[in-house]
Amino acid sequence: MRKLLFILTMALAIGVLAPAGSVWASPGQDQLTGTGTLGQFGDPTAHVNAIQTAAGLRGGFTIAYPDGTFAVGSATCLFVSGNTAYVTSQITDSGGPRQQTNSWFAGSYIVIGVQDNGEPGTAGPDMLNFSPGFAADPGCGPNVSATPVFPITTGNYRVFGVG
């Protein structure tokens, strides 16, 4: 129960800070923001807020499952190409029944892939995927373990790229 409360508190804190993220970002800076829930694989919800600023990358992620599994971390790399973004992050906290299966341990890395298909109801749904944990930093950019191929059932992601 305390872990679930922690997850909800973290998600709320990130949600409160997300609008401030647009203050950090100015035109010409890559960013990925949003929250989405998959309607499969246990219905996880992934919140991502990563903004490349002149001072460096800011942001993080929270992934939470209804069964209490969660992972929280800080963004280490943001890669944007068109309407698709990949965020590599280092996990700072995790727990729950899927922690071992997903290899989500503090200090390990995860890659989250998102495809922004426009505002909900205007095109197909945004797409999402995330990797299992990596013991070493997998690097920056597209990762086959996180290719965004699964549609979200609720939520919205926004991808902004420099070019």
Where are the regions a protein language model picked out?
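C-terminal partner/receptor-binding element of secreted or periplasmic proteins
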Residues: T122-G163
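Bacterial N-terminal signal peptides
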Residues: I7-P19
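Acidic, low-complexity intrinsically disordered segments
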Residues: N117-P120
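Predominantly extracellular/secreted and cell-surface proteins with exposed
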Residues: L38-V114
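Polar/acidic, low-complexity leader/linker segments enriched in S/T/G and N/D
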Residues: G28-G39
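Positively charged n-region of N-terminal signal peptides that target proteins for export
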Residues: M1-L4
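Sec/Tat signal peptide C-region and signal peptidase I cleavage site
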Residues: P19-P27
